[in-house]
């Protein structure tokens, strides 16, 4: 869900 977190 986060912009820069492993595609989450």
Swiss-Prot record:
Protein's cellular compartments: Secreted
Superkingdom to which the source organism belongs: Eukaryota
Family according to the record: Belongs to the allatostatin family.
UniProt keyword annotation of Secreted present: yes
Entry protein name: Carcinustatin-12
Keywords attached to this entry: Amidation, Neuropeptide, Secreted
GO cellular component: extracellular region
Function: May act as a neurotransmitter or neuromodulator.
Main location: secreted
One GO term (biological process): neuropeptide signaling pathway
């Amino acid at each position: 869900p986060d912009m820069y977190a492993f595609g989450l």
